[in-house]
A protein has these predicted regions:
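Active-site neighborhoods and metal-handling regions in enzymes and metal-associated proteins
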Residues: 1-269
Length: 269
């Protein structure tokens, strides 16, 4: 069931959005060649411990698409890892494409977001191109994420941008509602038919829009495999691959007119 939010509840959700957005912004600015994925995980752990009312949404989380409880505070997906990467003893190298995915509850309200970037001074142009694709898909979907439009309009907009770039679309994962829980209704696919959906976007509905789980770099025949825990990789590894990006403004709060950005990262609302 879709969890609609009152104006008061929307205000109560903002601290979680600011907290998650601030952590991801700081990590994007400080992560560099030589940074170990376990250092990133410990950084987030300390941030949560130091924040009153904050709890990790990941620790002990056991989704049906995984092989056991998650034991870390952030997902770190590098290069060909699609999403849900588990932090391990790996130091980042020049040119690594990194996706950091973070969900935290603050005073009972969840914020869930991710950011992707290339480490070092020698980025692969294709990595930069796929990041640009996801940024544009996010911005385009935000424009149609408003009351009266259907979820199919959002999904179709995402798919259209991916097709313009020539990327196949992975529909295995997608966006989702957030509120008191991390994974709520509705599911928002990365592609769909315009004007088609089981329900319309409504005022007070909050969800991670667009490239919420953007698996843009799947190649034909690379249906994917599941590594230990929740990590999703491609069955055949192309060059570098990036498949999830929520950049800067992934959470949306539907009001009566325009959506409201719910995770503050680059924009310091």
């Amino acid at each position: 069931m879709i969890e609609l939010k009152t104006p008061r509840e929307i205000e109560e959700m903002k601290p979680a959005g600011r907290f998650v957005g601030g952590i991801l912004k700081e990590l994007q600015e400080t992560t560099k060649v030589g940074t170990n994925l376990l250092e990133i995980d410990e950084f987030v752990h300390k941030k949560i411990v130091d924040r009153k009312g904050a709890e990790s949404c990941y620790v002990d989380y056991a989704p049906d698409f995984g092989t056991g409880p998650f034991a870390h505070y952030i997902c770190t997906s590098v290069n060909d890892a699609v999403l849900h990467g588990v932090p391990y003893d790996y130091s980042l190298k020049d040119g690594d494409l990194v996706s950091l995915d973070l969900a935290i509850s603050v005073d009972g309200w969840v914020a869930d977001s991710a950011v992707s970037f290339v480490v070092g001074k020698d980025p692969d142009p294709e990595d930069l191109r796929i990041i640009k694709c996801t940024e544009e898909a996010l911005a385009a979907a935000i424009d149609v994420a408003k009351p009266g439009n259907r979820l199919g309009d959002i999904s179709n907009t995402i798919g259209d941008v991916a097709r313009e770039y020539g990327y196949p679309i992975n529909l295995e994962f997608g966006g989702h509602g957030v509120g008191h829980i991390m994974h709520g209704d509705p599911h928002v696919p990365n592609d769909g038919r315009a004007h088609q959906a089981t329900s319309c976007a409504k005022a007070g509905h909050r969800h991670r829009t667009v490239v919420p789980q953007d698996h843009r770099r799947d190649l034909p025949g690379s249906e994917g495999r599941l590594d230990p825990a929740c990590l999703r990789r491609l069955a055949r590894r192309p060059l570098r691959a990036h498949h999830r990006h929520h950049r800067e403004r992934p959470d949306r709060l539907h009001r009566s007119h325009q959506p409201l950005i719910g995770v503050w990262r680059m924009v310091g609302a």
